[in-house]
């Protein structure tokens, strides 16, 4: 086990009756890094997160989080982590600030209002602080959810498919929030089925397939697993998501460099009947 690993998983197994979900999973997450667990639906990503969060007991293997064993020291693990599920766990009746204050008080922290205001500013939600969460966009709800999970400054945070169901603009908002977490030293383990999300965010990526980690490394290391590509000079066409973000001014550069005149529709020409 690496000394500076915030999360260590070795030989992890889990079955539901006859269904073997995890078949000997091994990986480590370095402190202060973003680690992406990439896999299709049903690969076992959420099962791993639930075990790491002490919500589910493993059948076999050794799992430690922040130096604590998830089975023998579950209470210590829960003090060290925060979990954000696939859907934002926010109270729609309350305002954004009230949600944060409530969590701070439930954790018996002093200065709940100050904590709330600091997180609102950190996640660019100050202007919406007094609005009910029911009026928030999907991206705003997810950012608030992540902000709530940081109350108490947990060293490790688990994000289970944090952009599920979000539009491209909201996904970009969440991506920026996740990058901010790592810059401040928080260890982030996120699960995703979006390849571009893992590519953009993660320091290391593990691919989970049929209950096993079949590849684990940096993006550059994973690319080395493919045979050398044949060099061809082609014009790179933007993806639809890149077009959408550029047109709406959310391409990450803060500018809109789109030639809107080219977007004007022209009726198709038709031949006159003879």
Where are these regions (language model features)?
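Conserved ABC transporter NBD signature motif
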Residues: 61-72, 76-77
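Catalytic Walker B motif of ABC-type/P-loop ATPase nucleotide-binding domains
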Residues: 157-161
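ABC ATPase "signature
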Residues: 216-217
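Conserved ABC ATPase "signature" region
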Residues: 82, 101, 105-128
């Amino acid at each position: 086990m690496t000394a500076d690993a915030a999360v260590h998983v070795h030989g992890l197994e889990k079955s539901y009756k006859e269904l073997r979900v995890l078949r000997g999973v091994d990986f480590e997450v370095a402190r202060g890094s973003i680690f992406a667990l990439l896999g299709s639906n049903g690969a076992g990503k959420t099962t791993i997160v639930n075990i790491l969060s002490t919500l589910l007991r493993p059948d076999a293997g050794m799992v430690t989080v922040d130096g604590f064993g998830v089975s023998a020291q579950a209470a210590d693990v829960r003090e060290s982590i925060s979990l954000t599920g696939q859907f934002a766990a926010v109270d729609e009746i309350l305002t954004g600030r009230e949600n944060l204050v409530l969590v701070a008080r439930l954790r018996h922290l002093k200065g709940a209002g100050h904590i709330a205001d600091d997180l609102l500013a950190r996640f660019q939600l100050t202007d919406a602080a007094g609005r009910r969460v029911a009026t928030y966009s999907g991206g705003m709800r997810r950012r608030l959810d992540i902000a709530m999970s940081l109350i108490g400054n947990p060293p490790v945070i688990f994000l289970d498919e944090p952009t599920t169901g979000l539009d491209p603009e909201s996904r970009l908002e969440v991506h920026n929030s996740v990058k901010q977490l790592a810059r401040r030293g928080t260890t982030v383990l996120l699960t995703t089925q979006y390849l571009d999300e893992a590519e953009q965010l993660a320091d290391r990526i593990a691919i989970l397939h049929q209950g096993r980690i079949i590849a684990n490394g940096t993006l550059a290391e994973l690319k080395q697993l493919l045979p050398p590509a044949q060099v061809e000079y082609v014009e790179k066409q933007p993806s639809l998501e890149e077009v959408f973000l550029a047109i709406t001014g959310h391409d990450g550069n803060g500018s809109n460099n789109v030639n809107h005149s080219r977007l004007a529709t022209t009726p198709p020409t038709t031949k006159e009947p003879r």
